[in-house]
């Protein structure tokens, strides 16, 4: 098995610059010029809209830029304290499957297992996209968002996990189109972890799921 490289982009990355980087690399993977890769990013503040967005779900964005992307999903927020993971994987390669639903299920399992390592019980909730953590009895809050795109069976975009994110920024949108849904982070759940430590665990857990 070839180990996939994880590349950490330094500082707070501009979303549009990162999107261009992803798209260029996807083209290289499609052309068999480059191997699979996973980018680890912490963005400067930005609201992004997926292909299923509704404009009324953008409530009050203030001076935070809004970017309309080609990923699946609706509005979300990216900013400091959030680990964004962009796997660029070739689902057409012999060791993978041309199955987008399976890929998303594997992403979910990967993130759930990574959160479990830190003592956070995370869940998938029917008809609600993303990864959810229990915050009170029978009450759940979203801790990670998922939005992907595939071109010629090569994946891009990915997952955003709230580590120490300023959760007040989510009030400028209806996150993922889910009205009245709570948003949480590792910090809010009492788990204080350095981004570098979190990255080590997601790399370990990735290799258990994406063999």
UniProtKB/Swiss-Prot annotation:
CDD domains noted in UniProt: LipB (cd16444)
NCBIfam families noted in UniProt: lipB, PRK14341.1, PRK14345.1
Family matches, as InterPro entries: aa-tRNA-synth_II/BPL/LPL, BPL_LPL_catalytic, Octanoyltransferase, Octanoyltransferase_CS
UniProt-recorded name of the protein: Octanoyltransferase
Principal cellular location given in the protein's record: cytoplasm
Catalysed reaction equations from the record: octanoyl-[ACP] + L-lysyl-[protein] = N(6)-octanoyl-L-lysyl-[protein] + holo-[ACP] + H(+)
One BP term from GO: protein modification process
């Amino acid at each position: 098995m070839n180990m996939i490289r994880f590349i950490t982009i330094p500082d707070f990355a501009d979303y549009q610059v990162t999107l261009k980087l992803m798209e260029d690399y996807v083209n290289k993977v499609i052309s068999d010029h480059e191997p699979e890769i996973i980018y680890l990013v912490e963005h400067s503040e930005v609201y992004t809209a997926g292909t299923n967005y509704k404009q009324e779900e953008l409530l009050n964005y203030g001076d935070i830029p809004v970017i309309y992307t080609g990923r699946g999903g609706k509005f979300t927020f990216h900013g400091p304290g959030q680990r964004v993971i962009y796997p660029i994987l070739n689902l057409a390669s012999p060791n993978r499957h041309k199955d987008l639903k399976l890929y998303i299920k594997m992403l979910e399992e990967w993130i759930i297992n990574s959160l479990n390592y830190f003592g956070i019980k995370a869940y998938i909730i029917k008809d609600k996209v993303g990864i959810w953590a229990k915050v009170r009895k029978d009450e759940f809050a979203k801790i990670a968002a998922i939005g992907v795109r595939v071109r010629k069976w090569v994946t891009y975009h990915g997952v955003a996990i709230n580590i120490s994110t300023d959760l007040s920024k989510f009030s400028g949108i209806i996150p993922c189109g889910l009205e009245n849904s709570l948003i949480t982070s590792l910090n809010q759940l009492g788990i204080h972890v350095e981004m570098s430590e979190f990255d080590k665990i997601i790399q370990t857990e990735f290799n258990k799921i994406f063999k």
